[in-house]
Amino acid sequence: MPKFDVSKRDLERLVGKEFTVEEWEDLFLYAKCELDDVWEENGEIYFKADSKDTNRPDLWSAEGIARQIRWALGFRRGLPEYEVEKSDVTVYVDEKLKDIRPYGVYAIVECLKLDEEALKQMINLQEKVALTFGRRRREVAIGIFDFDKVKPPIYYRAAEKTEKFVPLGFEEELTLEEILEKHEKGREYGHLIKDKPYYPLLVDSEGKVLSMPPIINSETTGRVTTETRNVFVDVTGWDLNKVMLALNVVVTALAERGGRIKSVKVVYPDFEIETPNLTPKSFEVELDYIRKLAGLDLSDGEIKDLLERMMYDVTLEDGKAKLLYPAFRDDIMHARDVLEDVLIAYGYNEIEPEEPKLAVQGRGDKFIEFEDAVRELMVGFGLQEVMTFNLTNREAQYGKMNLEYGRDYFNNPPAELVEIENPISPKWSALRNWLLPSLLDFLSQNTHEEYPQRLFEVGKATLIDESRETKTVSESKLAVVLAQPRVTFTDTKEILDSVMRHLGFEYELEEVEHPSFIPGRVGKVIVKGKAIGVIGEIHPSVLEKWGIEMPVAGFELFLRPLYTEPYL
């Protein structure tokens, strides 16, 4: 979870009221944070804020915390309003960036008055959003520049690796390749673009470099100080919705410091947009649903009041609340998310605890205990556990694995995916039906780390089952990958042998054809006459699609057929 430092004086300046340290401990809860530490430095009190929500980047700075508290205390109510003036600035996006880093969105914020604390918060927010929400700059990277040193129009273009500029913190020009080798940020984040044919550059009409996303700003325009009055904000990444949200978070935080937001026209090869877009988002919730799940006898008016203190505009109609909420939020996906805001405004400490009305004794689910035992077993074999996302997409599960969608590969994977009808992002448009692609994705993001990489995951795969009420079934699976020089089928089979021996099962291998694996080095795992998994050496063309240069072998098993009591 994100942690960051804030000044008590700065927070109180933004809120408009002073509080004791003890009062601040409670106030932080309104912003889904805990007060992790308090200390004094040069006569000033500082807090270590520990955010408890990775889906609320708008709360990862003093500006966001202060804004949330102003509303929660009733100093302001309803939807925050931010005026966006139209500028005459245009950014042109190069078509060659489509497979490198395709999306960039931009804004101008003028009339800023930055002291040291405000500058520190701006940099902190930029880093925290890119690190956590942006997955270490892979999904989102943010640059902030002195706009007075920039001459529009601006170009986000693909550049030759031999082009040069002076990176932030350096005095001499370096080529783009040299920046990846010599600059601290280049070494840290260079793997994100190193294998691309071109590198992204943001330049103005005079050819002056603003930045090399997602690596580093230029020394010329990328150094913002307390003397800076007007800034240009750029956010780049792979998902347009995600970079738009990050831009909204940054510009509204700067607006809390008195900045005036101006939009920028962004021209892509096949469309154009105006950014930022701070149009409020909408949602609708049943009031009785809120009352039922909250366990509180709240009137319609009380629910409306609580929501207005959480920055919603509320219209009550026919037992429902029609809501508008800020464009810097993207976490309202279900009525439970609205309920959470109602309870935060009400105060969790104000809810009377109730004793359970049934005398019950709890114990761990036996199959979950079995899964944990399998995890311990794999750790004992020297493997490292990873936990990857259940959400994925068809391309990752089939296309990158050399598989034909609609064809069953003895349930590893089955013929079809459970796909989301209206996904927020194409990247998260389906539930995975096997785990090996998730582990290959993990390996592809860690090619800069040392080898060997010996990984496993015990996780869920979602399969279509028309016989069930939900038409789906969630299956527990074990997947293993070994990424190391000269890895072979035998290396993986040794681990499979040990797993089966410890679980008390005999098994057979039947040679099969499976396009994800090298022909002749892939087998179907059979237990009691039933295929429960697949093992083999990953096909080089699959590794190439994932950007993995190291040989990989692995296996995947359904765990339910291996569950017996007692086990291990």
Swiss-Prot record:
Which example biological process does GO assign this protein? phenylalanyl-tRNA aminoacylation
- Gene Ontology MF terms in the entry: ATP binding; magnesium ion binding; phenylalanine-tRNA ligase activity; RNA binding
Q: What is its EC number?
A: 6.1.1.20
- A single Pfam family, by name? B3_4
Cofactors needed by this protein, per the record, are:
Mg(2+)
Reactions catalysed according to its record: tRNA(Phe) + L-phenylalanine + ATP = L-phenylalanyl-tRNA(Phe) + AMP + diphosphate + H(+)
Identify the residues that the record assigns to the B5 domain, covering every copy.
278-353
Query: Which family is this protein grouped under?
Result: Belongs to the phenylalanyl-tRNA synthetase beta subunit family. Type 2 subfamily.
Protein name per the record: Phenylalanine--tRNA ligase beta subunit
- Species for this entry: Thermococcus gammatolerans (strain DSM 15229 / JCM 11827 / EJ3)
